[in-house]
Amino acid sequence: MAPVRISRRDLLRRTAFGVALTGVVPSLVEGTLAAGRSEPRVGADARRLDFPIRLTSNCNAYGPSERVTAAMRAAIRASELDARKESDLLRDQIASEHRVRREELVVAGGSSRLLRMAVSAFLTPGKTLITAAPTFEVISRYATSLNREVVSIPLTPNYAHDLDAMLSCCDSTTGLVYICNPNNPTGTLTPRRDLEAFVAKLPATTHVVIDEAYHHYVDGAADYRSFIDYPIRDQRVIVTRTFSKICGLALHRIGYAVARPDVAGRLEAHRTPEGIDPVASRAAMAALADTEYVRASRMRNADDRQEFFNQANARMARWIDSQTNFVMLDADRPAEQVVAHFESHRILLPKPYARFEKYVRVSLGTPAEMQEFWRVWGLMPGGGHHH
């Protein structure tokens, strides 16, 4: 398929989501305090608080660890916390964790803010962004808001980034390439060896953002290796991570980028005035230290994901193999109808994605939530079974 060039007007017309907002649903889930679990609600749904089950956010369904919630409680009780000092301590801890220098690290209020910083730094007037379709859209939205051209390349039949097609669109005007790996919304991987070959062929003036928001959920894939854990030391590569997903800290919005010092400096030059809340810094430090919770969450997610596949198979429903905590499920009918059906039963699903008109993306919830999901699925005409 040919690449799609998107103008700002086109994107605003096609994107029914609007601007994502964040809310919080505190709950006790299987003995784990989920105070940090938050669900994006968009457009008209932002005003609707009547969805007890919201399978939209791709956050840890079980919330942050007890160690993290204890750190947050202690921070809230503290009489004085210096935001800059706490942010510096977090930066030091992340740098130590990844064995990088402080000057190679940029910490900000969420990975989405880092993506906006990258656009501001590397998409100067006349420069173009190349991205996949579908993929996480924040970076495209911000680029179009600055009247930058966005070239959107459909995924391959295997749902990987079509790196050959992306490369064919790269020239001296390409300022930035965005790769979400694993990809959102498909949950699929683009092999590491292919990405390395792709980066090596990029124009010297083109930078690439590799978004590893779902890195921790990858479960033993032989063709996946993180560009933070196994860096290639290419000065054009920027790797982003977030504490919002497996760590369950979406409410607190902390993300970070790893890049060569000069590139990190260019990102820092476009930092917005908002700082990082000191309570959020304390929470992120506790999450970073709680490696056992991350390990247990990965294992639990793998079990929950396999159970989702099993339930889908029992209903002869097709799905896209995922390496994340969400799954694209073929509803065998217009996705808009499926979303409306679930909303009528007080379950919130994301709006449909272009080129996937019969698929719904389902964030994995708790076992009780997923049991209700499948019950409501069975209430669709035909019992939700494929024909």
Regions found by a protein language model. Give the residues of each.
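PLP-dependent aminotransferase class I/II
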Residues: 236-313, 317-320
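PLP-dependent enzyme catalytic core of the Aspartate aminotransferase-like
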Residues: 344-345, 349, 353-387
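Active-site pre-lysine segment of PLP-dependent enzymes
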Residues: 163-170, 185-208, 212-246
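Phosphate-binding glycine-rich loop
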Residues: 79, 89-128, 142, 146
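N-terminal secretory signal peptides and thylakoid transit peptides that target proteins
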Residues: 1-20
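Conserved PLP-binding catalytic core of the aspartate aminotransferase-like
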Residues: 155-157, 302, 311-345
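N-terminal "arm"/small-domain region of PLP-dependent enzymes with the aminotransferase-like
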Residues: 18, 22-81, 96, 168
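PLP-dependent aminotransferase-like
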Residues: 121-179
